[in-house]
């Protein structure tokens, strides 16, 4: 069977999802799980983007073993230098350099000629080869590029030493039969194509990223670039779990090294750390992917799951457990269930999570997996508590002006404020904003029930923006929805401070 390389770009292209801001520790946590998933290549980031991004890529390169660790760089020496400095300690480093090749990008964005772009691409690959034997070249907006120019530039960069050539559908414009045909024609016309791996990178603007990727694979692509849960700019990227499971379920003749039993754990980890909720009807990993409401379907599944399920849930690692957790459950049972759900917490975080679990168990008769995931997501969101909620009291009701009294701890000092609002949450947020004088704006607030029942956990989500328009997301859970709302607001503010400082 033909080997298919899985290139995961969750930490680079996936992190460009609006509202996603991962810190170094969170990126490392995801990278380690991607290594367990057994992806072939991890694109760890874009080192030139910021000092924090550089440190995150460097940390991953130094600590994650197994996959190739790639760093993105524009086709300019400064970017390539920075990329190499970040990944040089990896046991398998790759520099991934790119330049746009479509006429609209060349003329409008780059303000160059085709010849100048060709020269810059070749120079960049030669420059990268001085550092690294494994160099990937991407022709940005390849789908809208002139075919003959694509052939010319790919032949030139392969001669310059590129080991991988990548054909991106940057704006998600292609249709599956068109994209597959493009890959086939490129393979037929690039004279030195046998010296490089052909890669594809599909965006989902028309909802066709997975279909386009599969079409490319059956037409000769040997590497597919994708993200967990389909994260990415605009409508996202091709979802890794969809591509892999399509190949596995349909028994396509390609060798894929992914450990599919790690898919569910990886999906949940990425969702919890990025704060991007998986849509319920998302293929493979959505909450409803294995749910059946129709009576006819339910009857069939009870008799034989294969009547309506083409994938065994165990195949992607969805845990099956008969253990019911409650207030009498001990730490061992709690930790075992965490491991089944894909979480591995260090001792201090495990202790804090277990403490929260026991507090919740005193309020709820039965603890569900969703409750546990909600609790643990608060523990693994590795953001320092610059501001900590010490006290919260709200007075509200019919005929009463909602009033919030809060005490927040900052560097050991307590700040007390009182504010009124249009409702209890509004009053709390005004009190927090009064106590913490950091320029920001509230962009969005939502509240949902994690599970059913009057004793359910409520999950609050807050989006804040700074003066530059950057988005920071905070989430928190509690059986008290006002408390959850306050904690979510503070977590978003703490993330802002962590990334931007208090100025």
From Swiss-Prot:
It is found in: Cytoplasm. It comes from the Bacteria. Coiled coil: none annotated. Pathway: Amino-acid biosynthesis; L-leucine biosynthesis; L-leucine from 3-methyl-2-oxobutanoate: step 1/4. Residues 388-503 are annotated as: Regulatory domain. GO terms for biological process: L-leucine biosynthetic process. Residues 4-264 form the Pyruvate carboxyltransferase domain. Its EC number is 2.3.3.13. GO terms for cellular component: cytoplasm. It catalyses: 3-methyl-2-oxobutanoate + acetyl-CoA + H2O = (2S)-2-isopropylmalate + CoA + H(+). One of its GO terms (molecular function) is 2-isopropylmalate synthase activity. Keywords: Amino-acid biosynthesis, Branched-chain amino acid biosynthesis, Cytoplasm, Leucine biosynthesis, Manganese, Metal-binding, Transferase. Mn(2+) binds at residues 13, 201, 203, 237. Its cofactor is Mn(2+). It holds the Pfam family HCS_D2. NCBIfam families: leuA_bact, PRK00915.1-2, PRK00915.1-3. Catalyzes the condensation of the acetyl group of acetyl-CoA with 3-methyl-2-oxobutanoate (2-ketoisovalerate) to form 3-carboxy-3-hydroxy-4-methylpentanoate (2-isopropylmalate). Homodimer. Belongs to the alpha-IPM synthase/homocitrate synthase family. LeuA type 1 subfamily. This is 2-isopropylmalate synthase. It comes from Dictyoglomus thermophilum (strain ATCC 35947 / DSM 3960 / H-6-12). The lineage of its organism: Bacteria, Pseudomonadati, Dictyoglomota, Dictyoglomia, Dictyoglomales.
């Amino acid at each position: 069977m033909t080997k298919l390389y899985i290139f995961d770009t969750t930490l680079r292209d996936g992190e460009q999802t609006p509202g996603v801001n991962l810190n170094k520790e969170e990126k490392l946590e995801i990278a380690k799980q991607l290594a367990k998933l057994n992806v072939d290549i991890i694109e760890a980031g874009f080192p030139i983007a910021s000092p924090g991004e550089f440190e995150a890529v460097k940390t991953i390169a130094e600590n994650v073993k197994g996959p190739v660790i790639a760093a993105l760089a524009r086709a300019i020496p400064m970017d390539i230098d920075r990329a190499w400095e970040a990944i040089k300690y990896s046991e398998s480093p790759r520099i991934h350099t790119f330049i746009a090749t479509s006429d609209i990008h060349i003329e409008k964005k780059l303000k160059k000629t085709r010849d100048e772009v060709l020269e810059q691409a070749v120079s960049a690959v030669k420059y990268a080869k001085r550092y690294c034997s494994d160099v990937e070249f991407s022709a940005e907006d390849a789908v809208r590029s002139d075919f003959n120019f694509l052939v010319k530039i790919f032949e030139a960069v392969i001669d310059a030493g590129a080991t991988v050539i990548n054909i991106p559908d940057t704006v998600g414009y292609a249709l599956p039969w068109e994209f597959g045909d493009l890959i086939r024609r490129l393979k037929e016309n690039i004279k030195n194509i046998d010296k490089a791996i052909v890669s594809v990178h599909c965006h989902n603007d028309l909802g066709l990223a997975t279909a386009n990727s599969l079409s490319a694979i059956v037409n000769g692509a040997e590497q597919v670039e994708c993200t967990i849960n389909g994260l990415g700019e605009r409508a996202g990227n091709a979802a890794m779990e969809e591509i892999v499971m399509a190949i596995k379920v349909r028994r396509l003749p390609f060798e894929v090294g992914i450990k599919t039993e790690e898919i569910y754990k990886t999906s949940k980890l990425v969702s919890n750390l990025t704060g991007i909720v998986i849509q319920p009807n998302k293929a493979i990993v959505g909450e409803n992917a294995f749910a059946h409401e129709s009576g006819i379907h339910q009857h069939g599944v009870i008799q034989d799951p294969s009547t309506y399920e083409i994938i065994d849930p165990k195949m992607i690692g969805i845990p099956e457990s008969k253990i019911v957790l409650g207030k009498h459950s001990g730490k061992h049972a709690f930790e075992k269930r965490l491991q089944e759900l894909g979480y591995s917490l260090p001792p201090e975080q495990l202790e804090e999570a277990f403490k929260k679990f026991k507090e919740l168990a005193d309020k709820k008769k039965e603890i569900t997996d969703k409750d546990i995931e909600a609790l643990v997501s608060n523990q693994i969101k590795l953001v320092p508590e610059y501001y900590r909620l010490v006290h919260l009291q709200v007075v509200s009701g019919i005929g009463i002006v909602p009033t919030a009294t809060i005490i927040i701890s900052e560097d050991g000092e307590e700040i007390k404020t009182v504010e009124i609002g249009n409702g209890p949450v509004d009053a709390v947020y005004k009190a927090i904003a009064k106590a913490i004088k950091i320029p920001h704006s509230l962009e969005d607030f939502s509240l949902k029930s994690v599970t059913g029942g009057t004793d359910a956990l409520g999950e609050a989500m807050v989006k804040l923006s700074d003066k530059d328009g950057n988005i920071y997301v905070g989430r928190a859970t509690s059986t008290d929805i006002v408390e959850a709302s306050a904690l979510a607001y503070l977590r978003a503010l703490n993330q802002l401070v962590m990334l931007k400082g208090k100025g």
